[in-house]
Curated annotation (Swiss-Prot):
It is an enzyme of class 6 (ligase). PANTHER family: ACETYL-COENZYME A SYNTHETASE, ACETYL-COENZYME A SYNTHETASE 1. Mg(2+) binds at residues 533, 535, 538. GO terms for biological process: acetyl-CoA biosynthetic process from acetate. It comes from Rubrobacter xylanophilus (strain DSM 9941 / JCM 11954 / NBRC 16129 / PRD-1). The keyword Signal does not apply. One of its GO terms (molecular function) is acetate-CoA ligase activity. Acetylated. Deacetylation by the SIR2-homolog deacetylase activates the enzyme. GO terms for cellular component: cytosol. PROSITE patterns: AMP_BINDING. Keywords: Acetylation, ATP-binding, Ligase, Magnesium, Metal-binding, Nucleotide-binding. ATP binds at residues 383-385, 407-412, 496, 511, 522. This is Acetyl-coenzyme A synthetase. It holds the Pfam family AMP-binding.
């Protein structure tokens, strides 16, 4: 099916699905618009509060406080409250390891017991309310256990993605001044191992705030244990007291800090607080995924990213759902691993990224056809815009043509889903995230700050505060204002572009700033450039994202070498390794083009738009009148052609 045909076809919710859906009344949009504070207050009451709030929203742009005066605990809502409602013996987490046959299941009662013990471990290590804890773990149950233990005692957690380098870990620990680091000996993924403890040891050479390191024995690999600092998880848990009451947290107390790529290169510590965030992810998990008591829900993200925080841990568990966690990759040890997992565990809801879907398309439906996926009833997409052809393929081959597809738009900053179909109500168009959810007020603005009404293209904004919104950037309120609020005043600027069609559907077009989206991972161009320039052979580098049918975008680096040195394949490989070491494997450039010069304006600014056009093979380079040396473009065209 061509992109054009796919993008004009529409799909109504299947009748049987719609009749049982959690949200069946389209009037919910109007109800939320009429009294959106009342709407969110009603949703918040689905949670357990030790004390109800005095005020739903206090808004002093750009600072929002939700459920002011309310007392709540995220861990209590995800565990104790579920046990009280009779879910103690229900499976909370089904864990599937990297190697087939490695499985673990934790019921709500079992998860609660583990969390209470680890909360006491943290207290015993001197962690108090307000102290940050860094977590650098593979996708194992100890990761959500550590997060929920932090939430239980009021210690903000800062999870660092396991593929990040020692330097990235060090920078994040130092920024949040974590007191304790929780890591593992190593992390298996796709048959390979990441030396997490060795990376942590390197990072800890320069992290003055860290007092203790807790190490999970995941693989049994031999690791260096520093006496007096490093402690084994299993030994601490063996001695831990079994009961730890949940702290009564203010609604606006910090739940976690999660670092995201910024256009300046310095990672941004995005701060999410407790009451508003939990309300947002609890509601969106229930409504967007239409959760039922017997669902087995699988979000394939890593918990190191916000999708895992919101839609593996806090959203599903606060709804009493059964969530599946997978440590491995789609293709190890065979390319039908995911379909085998779905069949064996009876997965009913699958939430994954377009990158994975495009990889499966390349293999064809063969691996899927070996398995019975009839348990699936809903499919979701996250991380980047999904192209219509991938949407159609997902719907037809994975969902058997019967499962609604919810294409979701949101960000680390928004905390939870913002634009998405409601699967029992919304007529979907492949490639469109459809409409802002009830209680979310999205709009499209032009560069001058005028709102575009009706069909049009511009910058995607959110016009009113919402409960899951980031409250600030950790220790950097100025950057918070500058990044999200300076452009349009009281309106949140997302950094994404969008188009609205004649039916009011939103089509997200991707980043408009200097952040690249590779397989749903946001990577700062400035961060990659500074990693490249740190190599002694590199004089200057410019990094752009070009379209890639597998990963959405691919990283391309244009590199000027010192002293007229010639580039070669060996040096290109060395530079990729340099980026891997400084940032992580996910940020390695797919293509490195050596060039004697870069297209710059007379003021010295690199014109990345021209580099992007050249990389994508486009002849129309737009306005080039501001170039200091137009001849550079011709020479670059030759360099690009030679590199292909």
């Amino acid at each position: 099916m061509t992109e054009e045909k796919a993008s004009v076809r529409t799909y109504d919710p299947p009748e049987e699905f719609a009749s049982r859906a959690n949200v069946r009344d389209p009037g919910v949009y109007e109800e939320a618009a009429r009294d959106y504070e009342g709407f969110w207050a009603e949703r918040a009451r689905k949670l357990h509060w030790f004390r109800e709030w005095d005020e739903v929203l206090r808004w002093d742009p750009p600072e929002a406080q939700w459920f002011v005066g309310g007392k709540i605990n995220a861990s209590y809502n995800c565990l104790d409250y579920q046990v009280q409602q009779g879910r103690g013996d229900k499976r909370a987490i089904i864990w599937e390891g990297d190697e087939p046959g490695e499985n673990r299941t934790l019921t709500y009662s079992e998860l609660k017991a583990e969390v209470e013990k680890f909360a006491n471990v943290l207290k015993g290590l001197g962690v108090r309310k307000g102290d940050a804890v860094s977590i650098y773990l593979p996708m194992i149950p100890e990761l959500p256990i550590a997060m929920l233990a932090c939430a239980r005692i009021g210690a903000p957690h800062s999870v660092v993605f396991g593929a990040f380098s020692a330097q990235s870990l060090r920078d994040r620990i130092n920024d949040c001044e974590a007191k304790v680091l929780v890591t593992a000996d190593s992390g298996p993924r796709g048959g390979k191992r990441t030396p997490l403890k060795a990376n942590a040891d390197e990072a800890l050479e320069d992290t003055p705030s860290i007092e203790k390191v807790v190490v999970v024995r995941r693989t049994g690999d031999e690791v260096n244990m520093v006496e007096g600092r490093d402690l084994w998880w299993h030994e601490l848990m063996r001695e831990a007291e079994p009961e730890c009451p949940a702290e009564e947290m203010d609604s606006e107390d910090i739940l976690y800090i999660l670092y995201s790529s910024g256009s300046t290169g310095k990672p941004k510590g995005i701060v999410h607080t407790t009451g508003g965030y939990l309300t947002h992810v609890n509601t969106t998990t229930d409504w967007v995924f239409d959760l039922k008591e017997d669902d087995v829900y699988w979000c394939t993200a890593d918990i190191g990213w916000v999708t895992g925080h919101s839609y593996i841990v806090y959203g599903p568990l606060s709804n009493g759902a059964t969530a599946l966690m997978f440590e491995g990759t789609p293709s190890y040890p065979a390319n039908d691993r995911w379909w085998d997992i779905i069949e064996r565990h009876g997965v009913t809801i699958l939430y994954t990224a377009p990158t994975a879907i495009r990889a499966f398309m390349k293999q064809g439906p063969g691996p899927i056809e070996k398995h019975d996926l009839s348990s699936l009833r809903l499919l979701g997409s996250v991380g980047e815009p999904i192209n219509p052809r991938a949407w159609e393929w997902y719907h037809e081959h994975v969902g058997g043509g019967r499962c609604p597809v919810v294409d979701t738009w949101w960000q680390t900053e928004t905390g939870g889903i913002m634009i998405s179909p409601l699967p029992g109500i919304t007529r979907t168009k492949p490639g469109s995230a459809t409409f802002p959810l009830p209680g979310i007020f999205a709009g499209i603005y032009d560069e001058e700050g005028n709102e575009i009404e009706g069909p049009g293209v511009g910058n995607l904004v959110i016009k009113r505060p919402w409960p899951g919104m980031l409250r600030t950037l950790y220790k950097d309120p100025e950057r918070f204002r500058e990044t999200y609020w300076q452009k349009y005043g009281d309106v949140y600027f997302s950094g994404d572009g969008a188009r609205r069609d004649e039916d009011g559907y939103f089509w997200v077009t991707g980043r408009v700033d200097d952040v690249i989206n590779v397989s749903g991972h946001r990577i700062s161009t400035a961060e990659v450039e500074s990693a490249l320039v740190a190599h002694p052979a590199v004089a200057e580098a410019a990094v752009i994202g070009r379209y890639d049918e597998d990963t959405g975008q691919a990283i391309v680096a244009y590199v000027i070498l010192e002293g007229g040195r010639e580039g070669n394949d060996e040096l290109a490989q060395e530079l990729r390794q340099q980026v891997r070491k400084v940032i992580g494997a996910h940020a390695r450039p797919q293509e490195i083009i050596f060039t004697p010069d870069l297209p710059k304006t007379r003021s010295g600014k690199i014109m990345r738009r021209i580099l992007r056009s050249l990389s994508e093979g486009r002849d129309d380079l737009g306005d080039t009148t501001t170039l200091a040396d137009p001849g550079v473009v011709e020479s670059l065209k030759e360099q690009v052609a030679a590199s292909r």
